[in-house]
């Protein structure tokens, strides 16, 4: 979180439990956004499926967005996705945006368009916040110690859904 003694960026892995609890309590009071997780059980995936991480990432994003829209968790409208540039391969910079627009918009599942942008997480507070929330679920799956915190997010209407893959 700090570089040469100055604040650099939020990193969920640098938060201890009290910091994560304070983070959750802060956002639970705000209740001005919705949180959706995509949880993947890697042990149930075939090696051939996982051989291209960009393809897996794009596919999981597509099927989860499809699910969220079809089940009215998110509206069928324009969507702006801000992603960590670590999820981008130079040769496929616009592939995800084209893929989502083809699979979800042209087919009529989504009535708007998808716009995908990639950022250095150090320069994007939304990605940093998402990183902390992601680490909270990851920590819970590893330790089982964050059930109360996840319940707080649910009870305050922030945590809307955890999409699990494979189904």
Predicted regions and their residues:
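Phosphate-ester processing/binding pockets and catalytic centers
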Residues: 1-167
